[in-house]
Every structure is written in structure tokens, then in C-alpha cells.
Curated annotation (Swiss-Prot):
It is found in: Cytoplasm; Endoplasmic reticulum membrane; Microsome membrane. It comes from Kluyveromyces lactis (strain ATCC 8585 / CBS 2359 / DSM 70799 / NBRC 1267 / NRRL Y-1140 / WM37) (Yeast). This is Phosphatidylinositol transfer protein SFH5. Keywords: Cytoplasm, Endoplasmic reticulum, Heme, Iron, Lipid transport, Membrane, Metal-binding, Microsome, Transport. GO terms for cellular component: cortical endoplasmic reticulum; cytosol; endoplasmic reticulum membrane; plasma membrane. PROSITE patterns: CRAL_TRIO (PS50191). One of its GO terms (molecular function) is metal ion binding. Its cofactor is heme b. It holds the Pfam family CRAL_TRIO. CDD domains: SEC14.
Length: 297
């Protein structure tokens, strides 16, 4: 991810926040962000990754230092409490949810459209029971997001953002179940608050023209910069104008079910946290000496 600064003030904001990372980790008692270690005390630390992650928080806050610092702190505190890595790799979710949400990867797609998260809400509305427990649905949806983030390379120039597709085929244009609205609102707020600058574009597909409630709900909870990434279309096959590789349901060749990744493996640091620390990552945690020796051999 390129670090671009249009002014000296923007660069200063970044430098101030970058220099304060270790203090923020100590204050929050949590040393993990999107599956990566923030402090340089063992082999899991990758400086260029942390550089780029911190830049995201600056950019998301228009390079205003207090806003960027506050959001980073809140994000780490939330991750410590919510345990999104557990939701992604340790918890078992409703099989129905796994059938209507998917992640695909294609190196043939344009930069930052290689990793795509698919959410088929038109199928979900037939099973309203999955939305009755907001927390349960949220943990599934956040887990899906975290697995997608594992497929990104924050140090690259062409794969440091995700693309999302929300398919509303067969969703009623006149009314939406209150439980679905509640879940949608909760997910939008979490992504806005704790996943800044992780999205390249979001497609709303198979949306009837008169279905204005969709955009009205979403725009209330996201920033102007985020809204600019939204693409709304009435026909899913219109996506061929944006993505080179598509599932058959959207004008491509292979079906979404056959294209989706079934097993996404966590990186070494995430595996360490889940197995050695039980998902908890205090500020002073370091890897075992044996692992350090292996890594430096």
C-alpha cells in the first residue's frame, strides 16, 4: 500500500501516530490488528505492514491526529473484547450462513478487486430466523471479514483492499423485516468504526430502482469517502464492466459455490494467538524462545 501525503501536515499526522503505536498498545493492552502484530519484539512483527495499517487510520480521519488516534484505540479495545479472530477461525456458525456468503480470489481481476466477499441477502431473507440473534449474525459476518483480510497483502500495491458484493435479488422493495434492518445497521456501524480503509468498492446488485430504502439506510452510517465507493446496479450481470472474473450467476463461467474458498488458513501470528494465547494478546506478549530461534535460523 503506497503511503501518499499531499501536504506536510498529513505526513506529520502519520508520523505522530506511528511513533505512538507502542504506547497505544500498552494503554489498550492489545497487540493485534487485522491479524498483524503492532510492536517490534519478536518474529511476528512486520514493520512495513504496521506502517500501512497506521496510514489507514490517518487517511480515514482526514489526517487529523486526535481522530486517528481515538479510532485506533477504540479499534484495539473492541478487538480485545469482541475477539474477531475467534469469530473467524475458532467458532462454528450456522451452516446456512456459510451457504449464502462466500469469499473468492482471482489474480486476474484489477488491483484491489482480487479478494471479493459475496453476501447473498436475497437468499437470507427466506430464513429470517438467522437474523433474530443480532450478536450471532454479527460474529459470523465479522468472521467472514477477518478471513478475507487474511488474503490481503497490506504491503503490496495491488491487494491491500477488499471488494464486497451485496446481492439483493428477491428482497422486497416495499418492506424489510425489522430483525434484518437491525443486523444491517449493526454491521454497517462496526465496519465504519473498526475497519477503516479496508474497502476498495462495494457493489449493491440486483437492486430495484425504487428500492431507495437500501441507500437511505446505508448512507446514514458511513462517511462521504465510503459512500463514493458504493456502486448500485439493478442487474448483477452489469458487474462484468467492473470485474474480469465473475461467478456464473453474474455472467461468468464457474458458479459461486464452486469458486468460493472453503478453508482460509490464518497467518502464523493469528495461529499463535489462537493456540498459545487463547486469542488474548496482552501488550507484552512475545513468542516462545524456541520459536524465535527457529525463525532466525
Amino acid at each position: 500500500m503506497p503511503l501518499n501525503f499531499e501536504t506536510d501536515e498529513q505526513k506529520k499526522c502519520y508520523e505522530l501516530l506511528r511513533a505512538d503505536v507502542e504506547n497505544i498498545v500498552k494503554e489498550t493492552g492489545y497487540d493485534e490488528l487485522y491479524g498483524h502484530k503492532l510492536t517490534p519484539d519478536d518474529q511476528f512483527y512486520e514493520e512495513v505492514i504496521v506502517d500501512n495499517l497506521i496510514y489507514k487510520f490517518c487517511r480515514a480521519n482526514q489526517f487529523e491526529i486526535e481522530g486517528a488516534k481515538s479510532q485506533l484505540k477504540k479499534t484495539l479495545k473492541w478487538r480485545k473484547e469482541f475477539k474477531p479472530l475467534h469469530a473467524a477461525f475458532s467458532e462454528t456458525h450456522d451452516s446456512l450462513l456459510n451457504d449464502v456468503c462466500a469469499i473468492t480470489v482471482s489474480e486476474e481481476n484489477d488491483p484491489n478487486q482480487k479478494v471479493v466477499s459475496w453476501n447473498l441477502y436475497g437468499l437470507l431473507v427466506k430464513h429470517k430466523e438467522v437474523f433474530e440473534d443480532t450478536d450471532k449474525f454479527l460474529r459470523f459476518r465479522i468472521g467472514l471479514m477477518e478471513r478475507g483480510l487474511q488474503l490481503l497483502d497490506f504491503a503490496s500495491e495491488d491487494n491491500y483492499l477488499m471488494t464486497q458484493v451485496h446481492d439483493y435479488n428477491n428482497v422486497s422493495m416495499w418492506r424489510l423485516d425489522p430483525a434484518i434492518k437491525k443486523c444491517s445497521k449493526a454491521i454497517i456501524e462496526v465496519f465504519q468504526d473498526f475497519y477503516p480503509e479496508t474497502l476498495f468498492s462495494k457493489f449493491f446488485v440486483n437492486v430495484p430502482y425504487v428500492m431507495t430504502w437500501l441507500y437511505e439506510i446505508v448512507k446514514r452510517f458511513v462517511s462521504e469517502d465510503t459512500r463514493k465507493k458504493f456502486i448500485v446496479m439493478s442487474d448483477g450481470t452489469q458487474m462484468k464492466d467492473y470485474l474480469k472474473v465473475l461467478p456464473k450467476e453474474y455472467g461468468g463461467e464457474a458458479t459461486l459455490n464452486s469458486s468460493k474458498l472453503e478453508n482460509i488458513e490464518p497467518n502464523a501470528y493469528v495461529s499463535y494467538l489462537l493456540t498459545q494465547c487463547g486469542g488474548e494478546e496482552p501488550a507484552e506478549t512475545t513468542a516462545p524462545e524456541q520459536e524465535k530461534e527457529t525463525a532466525t535460523a
